[in-house]
Swiss-Prot record:
<dbReference type="InterPro" id="IPR013126">
    <property type="entry name" value="Hsp_70_fam"/>
</dbReference>
<keyword id="KW-0067">ATP-binding</keyword>
<dbReference type="InterPro" id="IPR012725">
    <property type="entry name" value="Chaperone_DnaK"/>
</dbReference>
<dbReference type="InterPro" id="IPR029048">
    <property type="entry name" value="HSP70_C_sf"/>
</dbReference>
<dbReference type="GO" id="GO:0005524">
    <property type="term" value="F:ATP binding"/>
</dbReference>
<dbReference type="InterPro" id="IPR018181">
    <property type="entry name" value="Heat_shock_70_CS"/>
</dbReference>
<dbReference type="InterPro" id="IPR029047">
    <property type="entry name" value="HSP70_peptide-bd_sf"/>
</dbReference>
<dbReference type="InterPro" id="IPR043129">
    <property type="entry name" value="ATPase_NBD"/>
</dbReference>
<feature type="compositionally biased region" description="Acidic residues">
    <location>
        <begin position="599"/>
        <end position="610"/>
    </location>
</feature>
<keyword id="KW-0547">Nucleotide-binding</keyword>
<dbReference type="Pfam" id="PF00012">
    <property type="entry name" value="HSP70"/>
</dbReference>
<keyword id="KW-0143">Chaperone</keyword>
<feature type="modified residue" description="Phosphothreonine; by autocatalysis">
    <location>
        <position position="173"/>
    </location>
</feature>
<feature type="region of interest" description="Disordered">
    <location>
        <begin position="581"/>
        <end position="610"/>
    </location>
</feature>
<dbReference type="GO" id="GO:0051082">
    <property type="term" value="F:unfolded protein binding"/>
</dbReference>
<keyword id="KW-0597">Phosphoprotein</keyword>
<comment type="function">
    <text>Acts as a chaperone.</text>
</comment>
């Protein structure tokens, strides 16, 4: 059975892990880093993902995508080099990279994964993540909430009963979950969050400040300059990270722009105090969901035993101070906030494959589910923080006499009116027999699976007629679209492979030309001139092919030159061997010369007995 990997598909960085010898292990990427930037770019038709994509973002901002996770489950499209891509396709490219890195590490093909999502992701965002996995060639065995995964990794070896608060502030999303842990039993009591709050927002307040200060000093608005914006983002992110360890940092961006008077440079000091002032409302925004989760769990801050920090943004001192002040407890720092979610996903993969035993995980649905009823009211069928998997049914009736059908409008959210909540989908139940209003009985059933994905069924109890759907949001992808994207991804993977092979062949040919020139200088005068002329002609043929020939022409010319050089080398060795043999024969023919005090060897054995 092939290995199942655990993937933390993050907004700014992603991480992949696997179970090794009963322990979850993070898989480093080829650059040696344990997390990979969630960045995708296209340059001259070539797809670039991860570290390399992030490095070239400054010079290629229009064809580089960052933080695509923020658009999952929406109809957003990215245009790169003239081609349109959905968030699912961009995410699939990141997943393909992680899959490839895992395969290189394990030395075998990987086809199955457990992928994490923010706990507060709605159904369409979860479905989009699952679709991204499918496009990347992965069967997604389970979608796991990020705070739950973190608790899994943290609680693996813990035997004592404890109530933990997982505070997860990542690059683009924020979640807080309350769990009860007890010897392999993980029960989520409540979860809350904000899908539009993360490290990107902390970067943005620094960027806005830099733009504002630069405009005051030079009268130039950098927010209109795409290349300057990318440099500012990188500088803001670096400053934010620096200020977690030092009290002041210098932001230096030479030649950030130019006007009629010449080039302009951005040089500025940023203190931790100023950064905390700029981001104070963001820190305060994390407290709302934290209070909500505690309230839903029916707990007070004093009843929390441990606070676990997850996500790179929890390194910000003001964030740590806020949660410490709220709970009255020093946050636990025994886990790596960048890696713990992927490690937990690997543990869940181990549970599903049977490699990890005696672990029971009970998660919850983050948002209430229901339908629209008369007057545009949102009628809940399943309340938020209900343990999943779960199902619930309720009987409704018609609102008008002789109503021939009903539209079931499925929603997710907490507001009283349907219009204020998130539409997951709509479907119709038709052919209801004529009857006065209130007489027909229509049973609506909701079913949420362990991935948090919703199935809805409507049944006319009078006729037994039934209609059911698995919710795919209006922004979701149809099966046909997913199949097309899977094929495109496979073709792109094949094209990437061919492009890599072509580069390797060109490099090999180039290297062969260099070594041939070196070899021909060394053998000059030692082999026939005709052989050297033949090799030079073949070498020139390779050079010409490299300048403008097809890859087949390069390969053919390279193989021809390689064979000629090998023949020259063989002849050279044969000549050397013959010369050595002749020298040895000559020495044997004069083996008994008379002693005339001439010593032929390096030394002479003297017989002391004489």
């Amino acid at each position: 059975m092939s290995r199942v990997i655990g993937i933390d598909l993050g907004t700014t960085n992603s991480c992949v892990a696997v179970m090794e010898g009963g322990e979850p292990v993070v898989i480093a990427n080829p650059e040696g880093n344990r997390t990979t930037p969630s960045v995708v770019a296209f340059k001259n038709g070539e797809k670039i993902v991860g570290e390399a994509a992030k490095r070239q973002a400054i010079t290629n901002p229009d064809n580089t995508v960052i933080s695509i996770k923020r658009h999952m489950g929406t109809s957003h499209k990215e245009t790169l080099e003239g081609n349109e891509y959905t968030p699912q396709q961009i995410s699939a490219m990141i997943l393909q990279k992680l899959k490839s890195d895992a395969e290189a590490y394990l030395g075998e093909s990987v086809t199955q994964a457990v992928i994490t999502v923010p706990a507060y992701f709605n159904d369409s965002q979860r479905q989009a993540t699952k679709d991204a996995g499918k496009i990347a060639g992965l069967e997604v065995l389970r979608i796991v909430n990020e705070p739950t995964a973190a608790a899994l990794a943290y609680g693996m070896e813990k035997s004592e009963d404890q109530t933990v608060l997982v505070f997860d502030l990542g690059g683009g999303t924020f979640d807080v979950s309350i769990l009860e842990l007890s010897e392999g039993f993980f029960e989520v009591k409540a979860t809350s969050g904000d899908n539009k709050l993360g490290g990107d927002d902390f970067d943005q307040v620094v960027m806005d400040y830099l733009v504002s200060e630069f405009k005051k000093e030079h009268g130039i608005d950098l927010s209109k300059d795409r290349m300057a914006q990318q440099r500012l983002k990188d500088a803001a992110e670096k400053a934010k990270k620096d200020l977690s360890g030092v009290l002041t940092t210098t932001i230096s961006l030479p030649f950030i722009t130019a006007d009629a008077t010449g080039p302009k440079h951005l040089e500025m000091n940023l203190t931790r105090a100023k950064f905390e002032e700029l981001s104070s409302n963001l820190v305060e925004r994390t407290m709302g969901p934290t209070r909500q989760a505690l309230n839903d769990a029916g707990l007070t801050p004093n009843e929390i035993d441990k606070v676990i920090l997850v996500g790179g943004s929890t390194r910000i001192p003001a964030v740590q101070e806020a949660i410490k002040k709220f709970t009255g407890k020093e946050p636990h720092k025994g886990v790596n906030p960048d890696e713990v979610v992927a490690l937990g996903a690997a543990v869940q993969a181990g549970v599903l494959t049977g490699d990890v035993k005696d672990v029971v995980l009970l998660d919850v649905t983050p948002l209430s589910l229901g339908i629209e009823t008369l007057g545009g009211v949102f009628t809940k069928l399943i309340d938020r923080n209900t343990t999943i998997p779960t199902s619930k049914s309720q009987v409704f009736s018609t609102a008008a006499d002789n109503q021939p059908g009903v539209e079931i409008h499925v929603l997710q959210g907490e507001r009283q009116m349907a219009a204020d909540n998130k539409t997951l989908g709509r479907f119709n139940l038709n052919d209801i027999p004529p009857a006065p209003r209130g007489v027909p009985q229509i049973e609506v059933s909701f079913d949420i699976d362990a991935n948090g994905i919703v199935n809805v069924r409507a049944k006319d109890l009078g006729t037994g007629k039934e209609q059911r759907i698995t919710i795919t949001a209006s922004s979701g992808l149809s099966d046909e679209e997913i199949d097309r994207m899977v094929k495109e991804a496979e073709l792109n993977a094949e094209a990437d492979k061919q492009r890599k092979e072509q580069v390797e062949i060109r490099n090999e040919a180039d290297q062969l030309v260099f070594t041939t020139e070196k070899t021909l200088k060394e053998v000059e005068g030692k082999v026939d001139q005709a052989e050297i002329d033949r090799a030079n002609a073949a070498k020139d043929k390779v050079k010409k092919a490299l300048e403008g020939g097809s890859i087949d022409e390069i390969k053919s010319a390279k193989d021809e030159l390689s064979e000629i050089v090998q023949q020259i080398s063989v002849k050279l060795y044969e000549q050397a061997a013959q010369a050595a043999g002749a020298a040895q024969g000559g020495a044997e023919g004069s083996a008994e010369p008379k002693k005339d005090n001439v010593v032929d060897a390096d030394y002479e054995v003297v017989d002391d007995k004489k």
